[in-house]
Amino acid sequence: MRPIPSLVALILSATLAHAAEKSLFNGKDLTGWKGQPEFWSVKDGAITGQTTAAVPAKENTFLIWQDGEPADFELTCKFKLTDADGKSDGFGNSGIQYRSKVVKPEYSVVAGYQADMECGKTYCGILYEEKGRGILAQRGQKVVIKEGNKIEVTGEVGKSDAIQAAIKPADWNVYKIVAKGGHLQQFINGLQTVDVTDESSVGAKKGVIALQLHAGAPMTVQFKDFVLKTD
């Protein structure tokens, strides 16, 4: 009996989709990642970045994924951010870099798009460009970026307060980033936080993925369950 064509197509499609998925973290060690060893480790099955009073970061530093520079992709992971007391009342600042470039390899520093996160109630979910144009979209905004860093707010994808209410402080949350051409979308716990179309010539079309550990007061950030889907 010959296979039904539609069934063959379905199996092939599923195989290709599976082949395009990649786990970026083995849950055991930092194989495939590179950063400053005094800050990064694996604890309780999660990538852990930590600064302390005894070992502060002199500037923002990053853990950089070593296996490519994705262009169009969907990236999901879980993150947890806490202050020095293991809560969310104090300082805590991190982010997921994408389509970024290494600018200071000796201290693992990158520049580029950042899906931002913090312990506070304002910036978690915004699109920021590290060492570049700064804030590109506030939480809840739909924007188009023109030449000369002209940012046009064209609509909204949600209310900032509602997005914040869905974020679990000092607990695990899910970040999703979707990048296709100049269209960038970010989601936290299923809620879209920004929708950005970068039409400028400086908008990166591909680059490294990295995790930020922000300079400042002691804090801890953890990441796990990375899945990268590419076209």
Regions found by a protein language model. Give the residues of each.
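Hydrophobic h-region of N-terminal signal peptides that target proteins for export
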Residues: 10-19
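Carbohydrate-interacting regions of secretory-pathway proteins
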Residues: 18-231
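Bacterial N-terminal signal peptides that target proteins for export
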Residues: 1-8
